[in-house]
Amino acid sequence: MRNQAIQRKNVLLAYTEEFFSKNTKKYYIVLFLLTVLWFVWWQSKNPSPDGYQNEYLHVGNAFDLWESLVAGDVRLLRWLMYTGYWPFGFYMLAWPTLLFGMTHSALLAMNIILLAGLFYLFYKHRKPASLLLFLLCPGVFGAMLRYEPNFANMFFLAVGLFALQKEGLANRKRALVWGLALGVGLMVDRLTLLFFLLPAVIPSLYKAPKDVWKNFAVGIAAMLLCTAAYYREFFLRHMGEIIPQISQGEIDSAGVIESIENPIPQLYYLFSLLDSQAGLFVGSFMLIQLVLTLWNRKNKAEWTLLFAFLPAMLFFTLLTKKQAFYTLPALVPLALLCTRTRWALPMVVGLGFVHFLALGCGTHTVGTTWFPASWVSPRHTLARPPTLEEWPYEEMFATVKTAPKEILVLSQDQQLYEGFLILRVREAFPHAKVRGVVLDPIGSVEFFREIDHFVWMGPPTGTWPTVGGIQAELIGDHYQLDELPDIAEKVANAQSQYQEIFSAPAENGTLHLFSRKP
Protein backbone atom coordinates (compact mmCIF):
# COMPACT_ATOMS: atom_id res chain seq x y z
CA MET A 1 0.00 0.00 0.00
CA ARG A 2 2.81 2.37 0.91
CA ASN A 3 4.57 1.70 -2.38
CA GLN A 4 1.33 2.37 -4.26
CA ALA A 5 0.87 5.66 -2.43
CA ILE A 6 4.43 6.68 -3.23
CA GLN A 7 3.89 5.67 -6.84
CA ARG A 8 0.68 7.72 -7.09
CA LYS A 9 2.48 10.70 -5.55
CA ASN A 10 5.33 10.36 -8.02
CA VAL A 11 2.85 10.19 -10.89
CA LEU A 12 1.12 13.34 -9.59
CA LEU A 13 4.45 15.12 -9.24
CA ALA A 14 5.47 14.08 -12.74
CA TYR A 15 2.14 15.25 -14.19
CA THR A 16 2.34 18.55 -12.32
CA GLU A 17 5.93 19.11 -13.41
CA GLU A 18 5.02 18.34 -17.01
CA PHE A 19 1.95 20.61 -17.03
CA PHE A 20 3.57 23.63 -15.38
CA SER A 21 6.79 23.23 -17.34
CA LYS A 22 5.06 23.30 -20.70
CA ASN A 23 5.92 26.46 -22.53
CA THR A 24 3.74 25.90 -25.57
CA LYS A 25 2.08 28.71 -27.48
CA LYS A 26 -1.26 26.92 -27.08
CA TYR A 27 -1.08 27.27 -23.27
CA TYR A 28 -0.47 31.01 -23.48
CA ILE A 29 -3.02 31.63 -26.23
CA VAL A 30 -5.80 29.80 -24.37
CA LEU A 31 -4.97 31.53 -21.08
CA PHE A 32 -4.80 34.93 -22.80
CA LEU A 33 -8.16 34.44 -24.55
CA LEU A 34 -9.83 33.33 -21.32
CA THR A 35 -8.43 36.39 -19.53
CA VAL A 36 -9.65 38.73 -22.27
CA LEU A 37 -13.12 37.14 -22.30
CA TRP A 38 -13.40 37.64 -18.56
CA PHE A 39 -12.14 41.23 -18.96
CA VAL A 40 -14.81 42.01 -21.58
CA TRP A 41 -17.55 40.37 -19.50
CA TRP A 42 -16.55 42.30 -16.38
CA GLN A 43 -16.49 45.64 -18.19
CA SER A 44 -19.92 44.96 -19.73
CA LYS A 45 -21.35 44.56 -16.23
CA ASN A 46 -19.53 47.56 -14.76
CA PRO A 47 -20.34 50.73 -16.76
CA SER A 48 -18.74 53.29 -14.42
CA PRO A 49 -15.11 53.88 -13.41
CA ASP A 50 -13.94 52.42 -10.13
CA GLY A 51 -15.41 54.38 -7.23
CA TYR A 52 -12.73 53.17 -4.81
CA GLN A 53 -9.79 54.65 -6.73
CA ASN A 54 -8.72 57.69 -8.75
CA GLU A 55 -9.71 56.12 -12.06
CA TYR A 56 -12.15 58.85 -13.10
CA LEU A 57 -9.41 61.47 -12.59
CA HIS A 58 -7.03 59.57 -14.87
CA VAL A 59 -9.74 59.15 -17.51
CA GLY A 60 -10.47 62.89 -17.39
CA ASN A 61 -6.76 63.76 -17.67
CA ALA A 62 -6.35 61.40 -20.63
CA PHE A 63 -9.34 63.01 -22.36
CA ASP A 64 -7.92 66.51 -21.75
CA LEU A 65 -4.53 65.66 -23.27
CA TRP A 66 -6.10 63.87 -26.22
CA GLU A 67 -8.46 66.76 -26.99
CA SER A 68 -5.60 69.27 -26.96
CA LEU A 69 -3.49 66.96 -29.16
CA VAL A 70 -6.28 66.50 -31.72
CA ALA A 71 -6.99 70.23 -31.71
CA GLY A 72 -3.30 70.97 -32.32
CA ASP A 73 -3.17 73.21 -29.25
CA VAL A 74 0.53 72.70 -28.47
CA ARG A 75 0.63 75.31 -25.73
CA LEU A 76 -2.26 73.73 -23.80
CA LEU A 77 -0.87 70.25 -24.39
CA ARG A 78 2.51 71.21 -22.97
CA TRP A 79 0.89 72.92 -20.00
CA LEU A 80 -1.19 69.82 -19.22
CA MET A 81 1.83 67.54 -19.62
CA TYR A 82 4.16 69.39 -17.29
CA THR A 83 1.83 70.77 -14.63
CA GLY A 84 -0.19 67.64 -13.90
CA TYR A 85 0.15 65.76 -10.62
CA TRP A 86 0.57 62.45 -12.47
CA PRO A 87 3.22 61.91 -15.18
CA PHE A 88 1.90 62.32 -18.71
CA GLY A 89 3.60 59.17 -20.01
CA PHE A 90 0.76 57.04 -18.73
CA TYR A 91 -1.76 58.99 -20.81
CA MET A 92 0.43 58.85 -23.92
CA LEU A 93 0.41 55.05 -23.79
CA ALA A 94 -3.28 55.12 -24.67
CA TRP A 95 -3.01 57.47 -27.65
CA PRO A 96 -2.99 54.59 -30.19
CA THR A 97 -6.22 53.14 -28.77
CA LEU A 98 -7.86 56.58 -28.54
CA LEU A 99 -7.65 56.74 -32.34
CA PHE A 100 -10.72 54.49 -32.27
CA GLY A 101 -12.70 56.97 -30.16
CA MET A 102 -12.33 59.04 -27.01
CA THR A 103 -13.96 56.56 -24.64
CA HIS A 104 -13.28 54.83 -21.37
CA SER A 105 -13.30 51.52 -23.25
CA ALA A 106 -10.58 52.73 -25.61
CA LEU A 107 -8.40 53.63 -22.63
CA LEU A 108 -8.95 50.21 -21.08
CA ALA A 109 -7.92 48.58 -24.36
CA MET A 110 -4.42 49.78 -23.51
CA ASN A 111 -4.39 47.28 -20.63
CA ILE A 112 -5.15 44.46 -23.06
CA ILE A 113 -2.09 45.47 -25.09
CA LEU A 114 0.04 45.52 -21.92
CA LEU A 115 -1.42 42.13 -20.96
CA ALA A 116 -0.35 40.72 -24.33
CA GLY A 117 3.12 42.13 -23.70
CA LEU A 118 3.28 40.41 -20.31
CA PHE A 119 2.26 37.11 -21.86
CA TYR A 120 5.01 37.47 -24.45
CA LEU A 121 7.65 38.20 -21.79
CA PHE A 122 6.68 35.22 -19.65
CA TYR A 123 6.52 32.99 -22.74
CA LYS A 124 9.90 34.12 -24.04
CA HIS A 125 11.54 33.45 -20.66
CA ARG A 126 9.68 30.17 -20.07
CA LYS A 127 7.75 31.12 -16.92
CA PRO A 128 4.26 29.57 -17.38
CA ALA A 129 3.68 28.78 -13.69
CA SER A 130 4.84 32.23 -12.57
CA LEU A 131 2.46 33.85 -15.05
CA LEU A 132 -0.52 31.88 -13.79
CA LEU A 133 0.22 32.71 -10.15
CA PHE A 134 0.74 36.36 -11.10
CA LEU A 135 -2.63 36.59 -12.86
CA LEU A 136 -4.44 35.05 -9.87
CA CYS A 137 -3.33 37.89 -7.59
CA PRO A 138 -6.23 40.30 -6.85
CA GLY A 139 -3.78 43.18 -7.08
CA VAL A 140 -3.08 42.14 -10.68
CA PHE A 141 -6.47 41.20 -12.10
CA GLY A 142 -8.06 44.11 -10.22
CA ALA A 143 -5.55 46.62 -11.63
CA MET A 144 -6.05 45.17 -15.10
CA LEU A 145 -9.68 46.31 -15.04
CA ARG A 146 -8.97 49.96 -14.23
CA TYR A 147 -7.44 52.78 -16.20
CA GLU A 148 -4.78 53.48 -13.60
CA PRO A 149 -0.95 53.28 -13.62
CA ASN A 150 -0.68 50.16 -11.42
CA PHE A 151 -0.95 47.57 -14.19
CA ALA A 152 1.42 49.52 -16.46
CA ASN A 153 3.83 49.78 -13.51
CA MET A 154 3.94 46.01 -13.22
CA PHE A 155 4.46 45.64 -16.96
CA PHE A 156 7.49 47.93 -17.09
CA LEU A 157 8.96 46.35 -13.97
CA ALA A 158 8.66 42.98 -15.71
CA VAL A 159 10.40 44.41 -18.81
CA GLY A 160 13.26 45.71 -16.69
CA LEU A 161 13.66 42.54 -14.63
CA PHE A 162 13.59 40.22 -17.62
CA ALA A 163 16.25 42.42 -19.26
CA LEU A 164 18.51 41.73 -16.25
CA GLN A 165 17.79 38.02 -15.87
CA LYS A 166 20.45 36.40 -18.07
CA GLU A 167 23.44 38.69 -18.51
CA GLY A 168 22.50 41.55 -16.23
CA LEU A 169 24.23 44.75 -17.28
CA ALA A 170 26.99 42.92 -19.13
CA ASN A 171 24.99 43.34 -22.33
CA ARG A 172 24.63 46.97 -23.42
CA LYS A 173 21.34 46.43 -25.25
CA ARG A 174 19.83 44.84 -22.15
CA ALA A 175 21.19 47.67 -20.02
CA LEU A 176 19.51 50.13 -22.37
CA VAL A 177 16.22 48.20 -22.15
CA TRP A 178 16.50 48.29 -18.34
CA GLY A 179 17.10 52.06 -18.39
CA LEU A 180 14.21 52.69 -20.78
CA ALA A 181 11.89 50.47 -18.72
CA LEU A 182 12.82 52.47 -15.63
CA GLY A 183 12.46 55.79 -17.44
CA VAL A 184 9.12 55.01 -19.06
CA GLY A 185 7.94 53.45 -15.79
CA LEU A 186 8.74 56.66 -13.94
CA MET A 187 6.73 58.54 -16.55
CA VAL A 188 3.82 56.17 -15.95
CA ASP A 189 3.66 56.71 -12.19
CA ARG A 190 5.40 58.97 -9.72
CA LEU A 191 8.72 57.47 -8.54
CA THR A 192 7.30 54.02 -7.70
CA LEU A 193 9.50 51.90 -9.97
CA LEU A 194 12.63 53.71 -8.81
CA PHE A 195 12.54 51.72 -5.57
CA PHE A 196 12.17 48.40 -7.41
CA LEU A 197 14.22 48.59 -10.60
CA LEU A 198 17.17 50.67 -9.36
CA PRO A 199 18.18 48.29 -6.51
CA ALA A 200 17.69 45.35 -8.90
CA VAL A 201 21.01 46.17 -10.61
CA ILE A 202 23.08 45.90 -7.41
CA PRO A 203 23.94 42.20 -8.00
CA SER A 204 25.10 43.09 -11.52
CA LEU A 205 27.27 45.94 -10.24
CA TYR A 206 28.85 43.99 -7.39
CA LYS A 207 32.55 43.55 -8.25
CA ALA A 208 31.70 44.36 -11.85
CA PRO A 209 34.27 45.39 -14.49
CA LYS A 210 34.32 48.86 -16.03
CA ASP A 211 32.30 47.79 -19.07
CA VAL A 212 29.36 46.88 -16.84
CA TRP A 213 29.53 50.27 -15.13
CA LYS A 214 29.59 51.94 -18.55
CA ASN A 215 26.49 50.00 -19.54
CA PHE A 216 24.87 51.06 -16.26
CA ALA A 217 25.66 54.68 -17.15
CA VAL A 218 23.98 54.17 -20.55
CA GLY A 219 20.87 52.86 -18.80
CA ILE A 220 20.82 55.78 -16.37
CA ALA A 221 21.25 58.23 -19.25
CA ALA A 222 18.26 56.67 -21.01
CA MET A 223 16.21 56.96 -17.83
CA LEU A 224 17.16 60.63 -17.35
CA LEU A 225 16.36 61.40 -20.97
CA CYS A 226 12.81 60.15 -20.36
CA THR A 227 12.23 61.79 -17.00
CA ALA A 228 14.41 64.85 -16.32
CA ALA A 229 12.15 67.54 -17.79
CA TYR A 230 8.97 66.33 -16.11
CA TYR A 231 10.43 65.64 -12.68
CA ARG A 232 12.14 69.02 -12.55
CA GLU A 233 8.70 70.62 -12.84
CA PHE A 234 7.12 68.04 -10.55
CA PHE A 235 9.48 68.64 -7.63
CA LEU A 236 9.34 72.41 -8.04
CA ARG A 237 5.54 72.34 -7.87
CA HIS A 238 4.79 69.56 -5.40
CA MET A 239 7.73 69.17 -3.02
CA GLY A 240 5.88 71.10 -0.33
CA GLU A 241 3.04 68.60 -0.55
CA ILE A 242 5.18 65.45 -0.71
CA ILE A 243 7.46 66.01 2.28
CA PRO A 244 4.66 66.32 4.91
CA GLN A 245 3.06 63.09 3.69
CA ILE A 246 6.35 61.21 4.07
CA SER A 247 6.68 62.16 7.72
CA GLN A 248 3.05 62.71 8.77
CA GLY A 249 1.02 60.21 6.72
CA GLU A 250 -2.01 60.43 4.44
CA ILE A 251 -3.53 63.87 3.86
CA ASP A 252 -7.07 63.91 2.45
CA SER A 253 -8.52 66.21 -0.21
CA ALA A 254 -9.42 68.78 2.44
CA GLY A 255 -5.82 68.97 3.68
CA VAL A 256 -6.55 67.07 6.90
CA ILE A 257 -4.16 64.36 8.14
CA GLU A 258 -6.09 61.09 8.24
CA SER A 259 -6.05 59.18 11.50
CA ILE A 260 -5.08 55.55 10.86
CA GLU A 261 -5.38 53.11 13.72
CA ASN A 262 -3.05 50.23 12.92
CA PRO A 263 -1.57 48.44 15.96
CA ILE A 264 1.28 46.95 13.90
CA PRO A 265 2.10 49.34 11.03
CA GLN A 266 5.48 47.64 10.54
CA LEU A 267 3.64 44.59 9.18
CA TYR A 268 1.18 46.54 7.04
CA TYR A 269 2.68 45.52 3.69
CA LEU A 270 3.16 41.89 4.72
CA PHE A 271 -0.48 41.60 5.78
CA SER A 272 -1.64 43.54 2.70
CA LEU A 273 0.22 41.06 0.50
CA LEU A 274 -1.68 38.17 2.09
CA ASP A 275 -4.97 40.04 2.29
CA SER A 276 -5.68 42.17 -0.78
CA GLN A 277 -2.63 42.06 -3.05
CA ALA A 278 -2.03 38.34 -3.64
CA GLY A 279 -4.58 36.69 -1.36
CA LEU A 280 -3.91 34.24 1.44
CA PHE A 281 -3.19 31.19 -0.73
CA VAL A 282 -1.08 32.62 -3.54
CA GLY A 283 0.52 35.13 -1.17
CA SER A 284 1.54 32.44 1.33
CA PHE A 285 3.03 30.35 -1.47
CA MET A 286 5.00 33.37 -2.70
CA LEU A 287 6.37 34.06 0.77
CA ILE A 288 7.37 30.40 1.17
CA GLN A 289 9.22 30.62 -2.15
CA LEU A 290 10.90 33.81 -0.95
CA VAL A 291 12.11 32.11 2.24
CA LEU A 292 13.34 29.07 0.28
CA THR A 293 15.24 31.34 -2.08
CA LEU A 294 16.86 33.17 0.83
CA TRP A 295 17.71 29.86 2.53
CA ASN A 296 19.27 28.15 -0.47
CA ARG A 297 22.20 29.05 -2.64
CA LYS A 298 21.26 31.79 -5.07
CA ASN A 299 22.32 32.60 -8.62
CA LYS A 300 22.63 36.14 -9.96
CA ALA A 301 19.13 36.08 -11.47
CA GLU A 302 17.62 35.23 -8.07
CA TRP A 303 19.71 37.91 -6.38
CA THR A 304 18.32 40.39 -8.91
CA LEU A 305 14.75 39.44 -8.01
CA LEU A 306 15.50 39.67 -4.29
CA PHE A 307 16.96 43.15 -4.68
CA ALA A 308 13.91 44.13 -6.74
CA PHE A 309 11.74 43.22 -3.76
CA LEU A 310 13.42 43.60 -0.36
CA PRO A 311 14.78 47.20 -0.50
CA ALA A 312 11.47 48.55 -1.80
CA MET A 313 9.51 46.74 0.91
CA LEU A 314 11.85 48.09 3.57
CA PHE A 315 11.63 51.65 2.22
CA PHE A 316 7.84 51.74 2.05
CA THR A 317 7.57 50.10 5.47
CA LEU A 318 9.63 52.91 6.98
CA LEU A 319 7.42 55.59 5.40
CA THR A 320 4.69 56.96 7.64
CA LYS A 321 2.24 57.09 4.76
CA LYS A 322 0.92 53.64 3.88
CA GLN A 323 -0.88 52.56 0.70
CA ALA A 324 -1.21 49.05 -0.70
CA PHE A 325 -0.67 50.44 -4.22
CA TYR A 326 2.95 51.34 -3.46
CA THR A 327 4.11 47.72 -3.26
CA LEU A 328 1.90 46.20 -5.97
CA PRO A 329 4.90 45.93 -8.35
CA ALA A 330 6.49 43.55 -5.82
CA LEU A 331 4.14 40.85 -7.15
CA VAL A 332 6.33 40.61 -10.27
CA PRO A 333 9.60 39.50 -8.60
CA LEU A 334 7.65 37.36 -6.12
CA ALA A 335 5.93 35.51 -8.96
CA LEU A 336 9.24 35.00 -10.76
CA LEU A 337 10.76 33.50 -7.60
CA CYS A 338 8.13 30.74 -7.58
CA THR A 339 10.35 28.04 -9.07
CA ARG A 340 10.49 25.55 -6.17
CA THR A 341 8.01 23.05 -4.63
CA ARG A 342 6.08 22.60 -7.88
CA TRP A 343 4.18 19.72 -6.31
CA ALA A 344 2.08 22.28 -4.41
CA LEU A 345 1.14 24.29 -7.51
CA PRO A 346 -2.16 22.48 -8.33
CA MET A 347 -3.49 23.13 -4.83
CA VAL A 348 -2.28 26.76 -4.78
CA VAL A 349 -3.68 27.48 -8.25
CA GLY A 350 -6.99 25.82 -7.36
CA LEU A 351 -7.41 27.83 -4.16
CA GLY A 352 -6.28 30.99 -5.95
CA PHE A 353 -8.91 30.39 -8.62
CA VAL A 354 -11.62 30.03 -5.96
CA HIS A 355 -10.46 33.39 -4.58
CA PHE A 356 -10.59 34.85 -8.10
CA LEU A 357 -14.20 33.66 -8.53
CA ALA A 358 -15.15 35.56 -5.37
CA LEU A 359 -13.42 38.86 -6.14
CA GLY A 360 -13.37 38.77 -9.92
CA CYS A 361 -16.81 37.30 -10.62
CA GLY A 362 -18.84 37.66 -7.42
CA THR A 363 -19.82 33.98 -7.26
CA HIS A 364 -19.39 33.92 -3.46
CA THR A 365 -18.10 36.06 -0.60
CA VAL A 366 -16.12 33.51 1.40
CA GLY A 367 -12.48 34.49 1.71
CA THR A 368 -12.72 37.99 0.24
CA THR A 369 -10.91 39.34 3.32
CA TRP A 370 -8.54 37.52 5.66
CA PHE A 371 -7.33 39.89 8.37
CA PRO A 372 -8.91 42.22 10.93
CA ALA A 373 -9.53 45.62 9.40
CA SER A 374 -7.12 47.37 11.77
CA TRP A 375 -4.21 45.12 10.73
CA VAL A 376 -4.46 46.24 7.09
CA SER A 377 -5.53 49.83 7.75
CA PRO A 378 -5.63 51.79 5.51
CA ARG A 379 -7.32 49.02 3.51
CA HIS A 380 -7.76 49.61 -0.22
CA THR A 381 -10.13 47.71 -2.48
CA LEU A 382 -7.83 46.31 -5.16
CA ALA A 383 -10.32 43.91 -6.75
CA ARG A 384 -14.09 43.49 -6.62
CA PRO A 385 -16.95 41.95 -8.61
CA PRO A 386 -18.70 44.11 -11.23
CA THR A 387 -21.43 46.44 -9.97
CA LEU A 388 -24.09 45.17 -12.43
CA GLU A 389 -25.37 48.75 -12.76
CA GLU A 390 -27.61 49.80 -15.63
CA TRP A 391 -27.79 53.43 -16.71
CA PRO A 392 -30.05 54.61 -19.60
CA TYR A 393 -27.31 56.65 -21.24
CA GLU A 394 -27.97 55.70 -24.85
CA GLU A 395 -31.69 56.42 -24.58
CA MET A 396 -30.97 59.80 -23.00
CA PHE A 397 -28.37 60.89 -25.54
CA ALA A 398 -30.61 59.83 -28.43
CA THR A 399 -33.09 62.58 -27.47
CA VAL A 400 -30.54 65.33 -28.24
CA LYS A 401 -31.38 66.75 -31.67
CA THR A 402 -28.74 69.48 -32.05
CA ALA A 403 -25.08 69.19 -31.09
CA PRO A 404 -24.57 70.71 -27.63
CA LYS A 405 -21.85 73.29 -27.04
CA GLU A 406 -22.02 73.79 -23.27
CA ILE A 407 -23.35 71.08 -20.94
CA LEU A 408 -23.83 71.35 -17.20
CA VAL A 409 -23.87 68.17 -15.08
CA LEU A 410 -25.08 67.61 -11.53
CA SER A 411 -25.36 64.35 -9.64
CA GLN A 412 -26.95 64.08 -6.21
CA ASP A 413 -26.74 60.30 -6.27
CA GLN A 414 -24.37 58.35 -4.01
CA GLN A 415 -23.96 55.63 -6.64
CA LEU A 416 -23.46 57.66 -9.82
CA TYR A 417 -20.75 60.13 -8.84
CA GLU A 418 -20.75 63.43 -10.73
CA GLY A 419 -17.26 62.73 -12.07
CA PHE A 420 -18.45 59.46 -13.64
CA LEU A 421 -21.45 61.16 -15.25
CA ILE A 422 -19.28 63.95 -16.67
CA LEU A 423 -16.99 61.44 -18.36
CA ARG A 424 -19.93 59.63 -19.94
CA VAL A 425 -21.33 62.91 -21.27
CA ARG A 426 -17.89 63.84 -22.65
CA GLU A 427 -17.74 60.52 -24.48
CA ALA A 428 -21.15 61.13 -26.07
CA PHE A 429 -20.41 64.75 -27.04
CA PRO A 430 -16.63 65.08 -27.48
CA HIS A 431 -16.87 68.56 -29.03
CA ALA A 432 -18.92 70.05 -26.19
CA LYS A 433 -17.58 71.69 -23.06
CA VAL A 434 -18.84 69.76 -20.04
CA ARG A 435 -18.76 71.16 -16.50
CA GLY A 436 -19.89 69.84 -13.15
CA VAL A 437 -21.86 71.90 -10.65
CA VAL A 438 -19.94 70.36 -7.74
CA LEU A 439 -16.60 69.65 -9.41
CA ASP A 440 -16.37 73.08 -11.08
CA PRO A 441 -18.74 75.53 -9.34
CA ILE A 442 -16.75 78.62 -10.34
CA GLY A 443 -16.61 77.70 -14.04
CA SER A 444 -20.28 76.73 -13.96
CA VAL A 445 -21.25 80.21 -12.75
CA GLU A 446 -18.93 81.97 -15.18
CA PHE A 447 -20.38 80.20 -18.24
CA PHE A 448 -23.91 79.68 -16.95
CA ARG A 449 -25.53 81.78 -19.67
CA GLU A 450 -23.92 79.64 -22.38
CA ILE A 451 -25.26 76.34 -20.96
CA ASP A 452 -27.58 74.76 -23.56
CA HIS A 453 -28.12 71.34 -21.91
CA PHE A 454 -28.33 70.24 -18.30
CA VAL A 455 -27.90 66.62 -17.14
CA TRP A 456 -29.14 65.86 -13.63
CA MET A 457 -29.04 62.65 -11.65
CA GLY A 458 -31.47 63.29 -8.84
CA PRO A 459 -33.67 61.54 -6.29
CA PRO A 460 -36.59 59.36 -7.47
CA THR A 461 -39.26 62.01 -6.92
CA GLY A 462 -37.46 65.27 -7.73
CA THR A 463 -38.29 67.42 -10.77
CA TRP A 464 -35.51 70.03 -10.41
CA PRO A 465 -32.58 70.47 -8.01
CA THR A 466 -33.08 72.69 -4.97
CA VAL A 467 -30.75 75.18 -3.31
CA GLY A 468 -30.47 73.03 -0.20
CA GLY A 469 -29.74 69.88 -2.18
CA ILE A 470 -26.96 71.51 -4.20
CA GLN A 471 -25.44 73.13 -1.12
CA ALA A 472 -25.39 69.76 0.63
CA GLU A 473 -23.38 68.31 -2.26
CA LEU A 474 -20.93 71.23 -2.16
CA ILE A 475 -20.43 70.89 1.59
CA GLY A 476 -19.95 67.15 1.18
CA ASP A 477 -17.13 67.91 -1.26
CA HIS A 478 -15.36 70.10 1.35
CA TYR A 479 -16.34 73.50 -0.08
CA GLN A 480 -16.91 76.55 2.10
CA LEU A 481 -20.17 78.05 0.81
CA ASP A 482 -19.20 81.61 1.73
CA GLU A 483 -16.14 81.30 -0.53
CA LEU A 484 -18.14 80.23 -3.60
CA PRO A 485 -20.25 82.16 -6.11
CA ASP A 486 -24.01 81.61 -5.99
CA ILE A 487 -24.05 78.43 -8.10
CA ALA A 488 -26.76 76.74 -6.00
CA GLU A 489 -29.12 79.69 -6.41
CA LYS A 490 -28.38 80.05 -10.12
CA VAL A 491 -29.19 76.43 -10.89
CA ALA A 492 -32.22 76.24 -8.61
CA ASN A 493 -33.75 79.42 -10.08
CA ALA A 494 -33.17 78.44 -13.72
CA GLN A 495 -35.95 75.86 -14.05
CA SER A 496 -38.13 78.15 -16.16
CA GLN A 497 -35.33 78.51 -18.72
CA TYR A 498 -35.17 74.77 -19.51
CA GLN A 499 -37.47 72.08 -20.82
CA GLU A 500 -37.16 68.42 -19.90
CA ILE A 501 -36.51 66.18 -22.91
CA PHE A 502 -35.67 62.96 -21.07
CA SER A 503 -36.42 61.37 -17.70
CA ALA A 504 -36.04 57.73 -16.66
CA PRO A 505 -35.55 55.72 -13.46
CA ALA A 506 -31.89 54.78 -12.99
CA GLU A 507 -30.87 52.46 -10.15
CA ASN A 508 -31.82 54.35 -6.94
CA GLY A 509 -32.67 57.67 -8.57
CA THR A 510 -33.86 59.36 -11.75
CA LEU A 511 -31.75 60.55 -14.66
CA HIS A 512 -32.92 63.78 -16.33
CA LEU A 513 -31.86 65.73 -19.40
CA PHE A 514 -32.97 69.32 -19.99
CA SER A 515 -32.38 71.62 -22.96
CA ARG A 516 -32.54 75.39 -22.90
CA LYS A 517 -35.79 76.80 -24.25
CA PRO A 518 -35.57 78.70 -27.55
Language model feature labels by segment:
Residues K25, I29, L132, L176, ...:
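Signature aromatic-anchored transmembrane alpha helix within multi-pass, membrane-resident enzymes
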Residues K45-Y56, L69-Y91, L99, S253-E258, ...:
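Membrane-proximal lumenal/periplasmic loop motifs of glycosylation machinery
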Residues G350-Q414:
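Membrane-embedded, lumen/periplasm-facing catalytic core of multi-pass transferases
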